[in-house]
């Protein structure tokens, strides 16, 4: 197997692991939502799951490959159109982001109705000033929406799609996954705190900014992803095949 095929297989395995871990953490929504990865050796082709498969069914071998026009070039022709629109927005406009993750987790989606999601705990400081917002435009089936999604996300790889869900992107599977992990965690805490009648203590913008800079020394997913892959192996190693 040549180097390109080996690289492609590793991307497939990492992407399949993201699906299985999303199911494990309870962030999936039956067959809906989507996670994608740019195919090595191509400029705009990317892998996504076959429409109709639940996340616990996804494995490296049953992913499909899609080109920039939305044509399935490898695998069955079962394509989620909204998934293609949302993910191609990032793959076409942010080449530094190789993995893209869209989710509507039940525990956090209510926070997408906030004008802006407040920060309350240490973990969310790593996202301070890095989260973009995109207003809901109805179902994401209009190709014209792609440039607005890409512009609103910016280079931070974090986007709250208001009244809809969340979108994260990263150079690696681990970075992309852990951005989603911390974004969901931030929203869960925000919902819990804002539902309380107790007086809230919060830090100053200067403190949040300083903590955000401190977190830049830690790359999301660098240490967590190997541990998450080991967890995936213990849960069900069939994702690799």
Language-model regions, residue ranges each:
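Glycine-rich flexible loops
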Residues: 1-241
């Amino acid at each position: 197997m040549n180097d390109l095929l080996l690289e492609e297989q590793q991307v497939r395995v990492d992407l399949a692991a993201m699906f299985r871990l999303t199911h494990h953490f309870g962030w999936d929504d039956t067959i809906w939502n989507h996670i994608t990865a740019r195919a090595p050796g191509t400029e705009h082709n990317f892998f996504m799951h076959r429409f109709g498969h639940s996340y616990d069914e996804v494995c490296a071998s049953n992913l499909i490959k899609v080109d920039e026009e939305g044509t399935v070039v490898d695998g069955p022709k079962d394509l989620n159109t909204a998934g293609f629109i949302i993910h191609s927005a990032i793959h076409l406009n942010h080449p530094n982001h190789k993995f893209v993750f869209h989710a509507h987790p039940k525990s956090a989606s209510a926070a997408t109705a906030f004008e802006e999601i407040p920060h309350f705990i240490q973990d969310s400081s790593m996202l301070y000033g890095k989260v973009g917002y995109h207003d809901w435009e109805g179902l994401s089936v209009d190709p014209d929406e792609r440039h607005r999604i890409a512009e609103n996300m910016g280079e931070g790889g974090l986007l709250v799609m208001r009244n809809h869900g969340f979108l994260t992107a990263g150079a690696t599977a681990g970075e992309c996954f852990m951005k989603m992990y911390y974004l969901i965690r931030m929203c869960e805490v925000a919902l819990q705190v804002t539902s309380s009648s107790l007086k809230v203590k919060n830090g100053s913008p200067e403190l949040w900014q300083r903590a955000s800079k401190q977190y830049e020394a830690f790359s999301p997913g660098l240490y967590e992803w190997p541990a998450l892959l080991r967890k995936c192996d213990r849960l069900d190693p069939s994702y690799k095949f």
